[in-house]
Amino acid sequence: MIYNILLIFLSILFIGHGFCDFIPLLQTLNLRFLGLYILIIAINIYLHLITPSISTLIFALVSSIHFSGDFYPRNEVKLPGIGFYVLGLPAMSKTLEFKNFLIELNITYPDLFLNILIIGGLTSLLEPFLKQDHNIFPVFIFSYTLLIYVFGLMGIFYYMVFYHLPVSLYELIEKYNPNIVINTWIIGSIISGLLIGILINLKYIDEIYDNKNIVIGGVFGLLNAHSMTTLIWRNI
């Protein structure tokens, strides 16, 4: 019970940082970016309804680029970058668990999808040698490997909450007004918590599951749009 409450709390904090997207979007007041943000979400919903496999593959590729931005140089698009290892390692070490997760996402060929993630994860290990950076990468690879070995797929969640989230907030604080960033994160977390509480109390969970392709497509679209916004404020 306490563990589940903690997971919900951590999820709320993580979701809350997505509201910080509004800082660069509103600061530029570029309607094209705002329109693109909404369009990406709509396209992903439509795409996931038609072909969950392609939708999920695009999400995996975009997420790997996004996670690679957690490491220097952060203003480069790296594919495959070390962020692909974040997704590829669980596919290698927790194959059955990952395959069951892919089946829940209605992936048509889960084994082929796993192989793509594994190849990308292995290829991503070339990055520290190409960059001749042998300091942070071995430490991260060892730590993350241990994390996945102990916690399985939940290790990805812990990585996002305890590494990706602080890095993202730190970068935003360096670039924008720290008070605005922190307050936006707090407000976003409160809004996220209220929405999650409403969904749970009104027992919408079954309805969400019945329409999971729409929900998953929307979530993928929102996260892809978040990754796009991150690329924008990193001046790519």
Spans of features found by a protein language model:
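C-terminal ends of transmembrane helices
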Residues: G16-Q27, V62-N75, T123-Q132, P166-K175, ...
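Transmembrane helix interruption/hinge and helix-loop junction motifs
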Residues: M1-I5, Y46-T56, L147-I156
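Hydrophobic core segments of alpha-helical transmembrane domains in multi-pass membrane proteins
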Residues: L6-F14, S53-I65, G155-L165, I214-F220
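Cytoplasmic-side transmembrane-helix entry/capping segments in multi-pass membrane proteins
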Residues: T28-G35, L57, N75-Y85, H134-I141, ...
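Membrane-water interface signatures at transmembrane helix termini and the short loops
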Residues: F137-I173
